[in-house]
Amino acid sequence: PMEIVEEQSVDRIQEPHTTQPTVVEELEETETEERLPDENKECILIIDDNADVRGYVKSLLKEEYTVIEAADGHAGLKKAMKYVPDAIICDVMMPVMDGLECCRKLKMELQTSHIPVMLLTACSLDEQRIQGFECGADSYISKPFNSKLLLVRLRNLIDNHKRLKQFFGDKI
């Protein structure tokens, strides 16, 4: 029954509107209230269509972080708006909404624009990296990746964001 309600809600989003709603308005109509398992830990959102990759990255992070998962950019955008995680790890090539579009939308929304986004992808050419950074990505790691590199880079992104927040106060 819950899945049917969600599917009907998603269909409602796709109906034409007289005015263009913001992403936040669309998501507020569809989301139900949930709580994170451990609100004392920093929260990481993993967006990847490959369940094995999501599972592996989650296994690296679960001791230190609360981990939320999404299988495509659209679902990831919804979860980012709902939970406002401390960082996002996102694949580039995914169905529904790719990682570049997801990153661009995250950085355009006031509510999520401050969240560090790490692109974790098989796309490793400099031109592809440039495209990722132009979409607003804060970091770019190519698959296959070194797990220690991912963990250190993620920790640095979160720590740098915390320092900015301390320096500028609650303005960011």
Predicted regions and their residues:
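Receiver (REC) domain active-site loop signature in two-component systems and cognate sites
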Residues: 94
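Short hydrophobic/Thr-rich beta-strand motif most characteristic of the beta2 strand and flanking loop
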Residues: 65-71, 79
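Active-site beta3 strand of CheY-like receiver
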Residues: 83-89
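C-terminal output helix
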Residues: 145-154, 158, 166
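Charged docking surfaces used in two-component/phosphorelay signaling
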Residues: 55-62
